[in-house]
Amino acid sequence: MNRSLLLRLSDTGEPITSCSYGKGVLTLPPIPLPKDAPKDQPLYTVKLLVSAGSPVARDGLVWTNCPPDHNTPFKRDKFYKKIIHSSFHEDDCIDLNVYAPGSYCFYLSFRNDNEKLETTRKYYFVALPMLYINDQFLPLNSIALQSVVSKWLGSDWEPILSKIAAKNYNMVHFTPLQERGESNSPYSIYDQLQFDQEHFKSPEDVKNLVEHIHRDLNMLSLTDIVFNHTANNSPWLVEHPEAGYNHITAPHLISAIELDQELLNFSRNLKSWGYPTELKNIEDLFKIMDGIKVHVLGSLKLWEYYAVNVQTALRDIKAHWNDESNESYSFPENIKDISSDFVKLASFVKDNVTEPNFGTLGERNSNRINVPKFIQLLKLINDGGSDDSESSLATAQNILNEVNLPLYREYDDDVSEILEQLFNRIKYLRLDDGGPKQGPVTVDVPLTEPYFTRFKGKDGTDYALANNGWIWNGNPLVDFASQNSRAYLRREVIVWGDCVKLRYGKSPEDSPYLWERMSKYIEMNAKIFDGFRIDNCHSTPIHVGEYFLDLARKYNPNLYVVAELFSGSETLDCLFVERLGISSLIREAMQAWSEEELSRLVHKHGGRPIGSYKFVPMDDFSYPADINLNEEHCFNDSNDNSIRCVSEIMIPKILTATPPHALFMDCTHDNETPFEKRTVEDTLPNAALVALCSSAIGSVYGYDEIFPHLLNLVTEKRHYDISTPTGSPSIGITKVKATLNSIRTSIGEKAYDIEDSEMHVHHQGQYITFHRMDVKSGKGWYLIARMKFSDNDDPNETLPPVVLNQSTCSLRFSYALERVGDEIPNDDKFIKGIPTKLKELEGFDISYDDSKKISTIKLPNEFPQGSIAIFETQQNGVDESLDHFIRSGALKATSSLTLESINSVLYRSEPEEYDVSAGEGGAYIIPNFGKPVYCGLQGWVSVLRKIVFYNDLAHPLSANLRNGHWALDYTISRLNYYSDEAGINEVQNWLRSRFDRVKKLPSYLVPSYFALIIGILYGCCRLKAIQLMSRNIGKSTLFVQSLSMTSIQMVSRMKSTSILPGENVPSMAAGLPHFSVNYMRCWGRDVFISLRGMLLTTGRFDEAKAHILAFAKTLKHGLIPNLLDAGRNPRYNARDAAWFFLQAVQDYVYIVPDGEKILQEQVTRRFPLDDTYIPVDDPRAFSYSSTLEEIIYEILSRHAKGIKFREANAGPNLDRVMTDKGFNVEIHVDWSTGLIHGGSQYNCGTWMDKMGESEKAGSVGIPGTPRDGAAIEINGLLKSALRFVIELKNKGLFKFSDVETQDGGRIDFTEWNQLLQDNFEKRYYVPEDPSQDADYDVSAKLGVNRRGIYRDLYKSGKPYEDYQLRPNFAIAMTVAPELFVPEHAIKAITIADEVLRGPVGMRTLDPSDYNYRPYYNNGEDSDDFATSKGRNYHQGPEWVWLYGYFLRAFHHFHFKTSPRCQNAAKEKPSSYLYQQLYYRLKGHRKWIFESVWAGLTELTNKDGEVCNDSSPTQAWSSACLLDLFYDLWDAYEDDS
């Protein structure tokens, strides 16, 4: 049974979101275990996916407080470690088993670059509770709660509770049932451990009541928990005043206590001092404020709490000046430099020469200096003198005055705030129309509320304990009674005079009795109730909430926790939710000030929009080749509470952050009623809108009964009226509420997941329409609500006919709430509602147009303000079978695909599609957007990825899919071009059958199902591709698999070209779309640089062999052609292609099983052996055969003898910008060194082959980078080839042993190999020490720009170019590392790492070179010789393919030379080396994931900036990185 959720971690260990739901919490869905599940079955398994090579994987550990088994109790601060086993190329999954609901966390520890252990922050996730009523599971979104205030229930609770049950509420919320304090407020608890004795003699009585509510009324129970305060007359405070904030536990409040006392004194003496005792107007208030300034602030001398008492300090200095101090203090050496700057001295003294807690308010004059230390300072700045004369004291006084200056400013600011707060509060209490207008000032009702509760403790001490309250826009993470706040002094607290704020401290040790008492309180309630409502949660210290909720869950694991949380910040809300494990946050509909705002709230809590995209992991995860597959996996068996995967590929469901779950209240016991805030009539539509939301919902008793006013929890003494029988039509909206709650139950039964329920909200004037849909069945409920926010709203406003597209509907009921009487005069005994009646509305005109598939609803003439109409709807084409049908069958449909046919399904750039379709096909055009870059599924996926993530229903593609079925038809019909390929018909049939179902759906559902179908098929194709490749690919990471998928991108069958002139076979494109068709598709150099990565590492041995043999056919002049053109008109202008060809043959022989057999393969030769150029249809073409062994020898022998020819068909028809001399090709070996030299200043025969072509700049025919001479990479490849043939010769696999030189002599391969070995370092290395130049053939006169490097060229036509730093040396290092002195190599690599390495590519020239031009723009036609027409193609732009060679060299030489880069056994790379490689691939991972081409670009501009003229996906860019991974697999892995 699958109950796993996958959570991806970033390189920093942070969870990665898979969908954008805004601010959110990682929440595990409440899906109950089957009844027969074993006890040790986890509720969930959270699988943490750590990427291979991630920095956090280096010596990485996951630490979690998830208990290791079901028998181990949860302890929040007990962490268990799990080892991260990921390697560089294989991810790791760490399982966190969750056995009970609650809040859990994990963090990671790892070794960082500095060899220090580092830890991440803690990451939290919440497992929601499983609620049951009489063994019936209750989803959280089905909760319908009603609050009751227990003291208003009277002596007989049964009638009210029965009424609540009759209204189909399934949870009752009790305000605190404990004994109340003197104010009689339920939230001012007299004794936390004693229930209200009027109703309950013992906790057992409460338990019996709750059991009755469960058993007989079919409801759950929830009670308030009050952590933050206790009643001001709680008797236990007298014995334990340390439980509050007083002058002993919180000395920083002493000044606030004194201020409060003086305000009370002033209040008592108003009359005797001649101030008004009953404020009539603002002038009276001004008089009062003047009195406060004089009699309160004037007498208090509050500045003594802030400033240093200068006179006292001076007396102490004078008295102790000559004391011999036992302690010597050290001061900064430069202290004398500021001896005359009293401001700087004061700052130093304040920070360094004061007593502890300086600056914190405490007792009067508690801000003091350290006198002995200050005396030493004064003597030091007075040159050590012992004089205690007036001058020293004057200096001290000046310093202390400066110290005091900012302290007095603080005092002034605080006093100003005190006056401001007092003015506003007294004005509210006494004068404001919206305030209580308290009347005369008396002893019982003082001028302003007392901030402190005063009493004599049991120890005889007089105590003043801070009362609790709240602060406007306060930071909930700061305790406003702590020393970090001056809120009590500044009178910023809106105080509750009947509640003493509780002081928990940091842990139970700080207030043992309080923690023990509250623990008993929590335990008692957790054993009885099903849920807690955390009162005033935003003021609850988080560590306190964690402690007590953990304790509560010990006794009730499935405790439902709701919170009153008004932090003012979504981020802070999420913090409380994840730390405390809050199930739902209370949200209030009555806070809406308009219909528009209410519709916004309903939209927020109503569910996802109808037609929302469903997450499907298209290219988000690697697909292990042996992954579990189950074609029935998507079938939802009602008896199996598994967490369903999204397709038959059994990747676990993804855990991603979602907004905190809401308990959306139509009205709370703290809200003004509709009668007060809006109108009576608005009660009904407001309730209906809330009822249909995809959240828990709630109400307060009296809302349904139309109570007129917000009832005061303190002063209200009446009881609920129980005289009217349940269900009577005169009782408000109770009848409708019962029906609405019943509807909610039916909706919520199957809505476990956030994707299961969708809605649409529309606001138009007084009307709000709300459509709630069950995604799986297509059944829905449509509400038309006409609001009445004000009696002044236009009664004649109408709603146009409502049109429901492709849905049928029928009226379920419609009512209007009418007020039939005035507010009932005050009843001394009972709380009664306003007389109303529900009027049933009729006359709706509902029609269905079968031809248009639309339903139309026309409202009756009578649909007054305060009306609702509820309709049942059914979407066309949607039923319980649809979801399973869509998600199934794709595995079977893709089972016959080959890599070639997968290319046709997934890829095909537009030029390729045009080529195959003879110009008929092409990419799909999305209006107002453009074309996807591929015609196949990858084109859709690249567009859909962000659309799905952001649920972008307004995207042009979403609109296009709603407007018609063109994209569906296109996706099927384009595959007709490939119908003869393996498996294509099966894929077409699967698509056709699924799309046929989709075409029957409402148009607004088409985008979602289209994306789902595309995503599922794409995933199955991708999995099939991985299964068809080598085992290493199947074991590897998403990044490696994405690189390997580019192999499929690049190799396909074209009509316009091939690798053979007479046979249409798959050929490798150099890149897409620039090099996709005709003669521009296949390049010898590109093919053989790419062959190892694209074809051999992926296990595509047949394709590799075909390319090798096809190019072997075209060997001419001892060269492999650059442009192949299917062998029709090959061009031989590349000096390096033959060497990359030989390297590819070597790789083939060593990688492919029995690979050496290819050496004896016969190839027919395109040209005669005398190099005569003939057309492809000449009878002599392909008339002679050679073995590949002979081809290899021919390349070596022709180079040894020297090559000199003029290109066939030379002239402008062959190359329009080449000068005449450029067509002359020359190559020779310098037999004094064994190095191959070649080329001229008129051509560019290496991969850096950009020819100048700007007439405006005068660069036509002048190569940007001729690189004539001995190019370093060619000679590295030569060395590799010689080593290869020597090894073959030694094995008896190569019959040749020597070659003829240009002077007629002969040289053995072994001699040539040694000659290169002896001369390479001497000719290429540029020593760091100039004194060694002579040993390395370095001429400083030629302008050595950088040392410690390997030159790019030797003996080029421009001598300074010899010493240029380019990245080509890494190629030589990779293929022939034996040529390099390791210490030199490491230095050169380090320099290149710092100088040449960009985010994704290697800079093609040292940025310090005056020729460096890093921005390539081929369209530029300027007079700039260096850049016009892109002549700087290889003069700074950052090429990606070289990055792979660089990292291969980086790995080889670091592992070889650095112990830090080796494991303990020195057999494998250390985690440090893997981390270094991983870090350097960060840009590539990001690029390939974000690229719409799903590949790596050819090149970038400076620092990885996108180059618009670059081919966006290039074969060698991906291939050379796959080469790196193969190096590691081959060297260090057991299997392949």
From Swiss-Prot:
Regulation: Activity is inhibited by IGD1.
Domain of life from the UniProt record: Eukaryota
Gene Ontology biological process: glycogen biosynthetic process; glycogen catabolic process
Active site annotation, chain numbering: 535, 538, 670
One term of GO molecular function: amylo-alpha-1,6-glucosidase activity
Matches recorded under CDD domains: AmyAc_Glg_debranch_2 (cd11327)
Entry keywords, A to Z: Cytoplasm, Glycogen biosynthesis, Glycosidase, Glycosyltransferase, Hydrolase, Mitochondrion, Multifunctional enzyme, Transferase
Subcellular location per the Swiss-Prot or TrEMBL entry: Mitochondrion; Cytoplasm
Keyword Zinc-finger: no
Gene3D superfamilies, sorted: 1.50.10.10, Glycosidases
The enzyme's E.C. designation: 2.4.1.25, 3.2.1.33
InterPro entries (alphabetical): 6-hairpin_glycosidase_sf (IPR008928), 6hp_glycosidase-like_sf (IPR012341), AGL/Gdb1 (IPR010401), AGL_central (IPR032788), AGL_euk_N (IPR029436), AGL_glucanoTrfase (IPR032792), GDE_C (IPR032790), Glycogen_debranch_met (IPR006421)
Reaction equation(s) it catalyzes: Transfers a segment of a (1->4)-alpha-D-glucan to a new position in an acceptor, which may be glucose or a (1->4)-alpha-D-glucan; Hydrolysis of (1->6)-alpha-D-glucosidic branch linkages in glycogen phosphorylase limit dextrin
Gene Ontology, cellular component aspect: cytoplasm; mitochondrion
Quaternary context: Interacts with IGD1.
Further comment found in the protein's record: Present with 125 molecules/cell in log phase SD medium.
Stated family: Belongs to the glycogen debranching enzyme family.
Biological role stated in the UniProt entry: Multifunctional enzyme acting as 1,4-alpha-D-glucan:1,4-alpha-D-glucan 4-alpha-D-glycosyltransferase and amylo-1,6-glucosidase in glycogen degradation.
Full protein name: Glycogen debranching enzyme
Organism: Saccharomyces cerevisiae (strain ATCC 204508 / S288c)
